[in-house]
Amino acid sequence: MTRFLSISSFRKRLADLLKVRRGVYAGVKSEICTAFRNATIEQIRQNRDMILMNNESVVIKLRLPDKRQRLSRSDGYRLVYMVLKTAPVVVLLDIYPKRGPSQQLDIEDNELNMLILEFVSELKSKKLLEHDIENDLNAKQ
């Protein structure tokens, strides 16, 4: 069973997107869940845009559609996540829209490095949060 964890920056970014007026990004949690639901860890590790790879993990940028606004994968969201090579674990690092009031065109190398350092720090301090991909990305009890 694949475990889905997140760092605090991801959770803050997701919460900020959900607060944007008129519910512009209201479908973001659903799109994330749909992308991973019923996928094996092998499927999650492959067929994506790899950003960074080392001996222990792969960082991937996944293109997600925004079906609520009728945007294709190229105009929807970018989900940046890390997949561990030694365990069935996915760590959600960042999410950003390509369109709309909170749009971001890409993730810079220094931003990515900061997210990875945050993961290492939160892993050590046990601040990572586990999510239920079958239950709208809610925190697992």
Where on the chain are the PLM-derived regions?
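A broad, low-specificity signal marking well-ordered, structured residues that form hydrophobic/aromatic
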Residues: 4, 59-60, 90
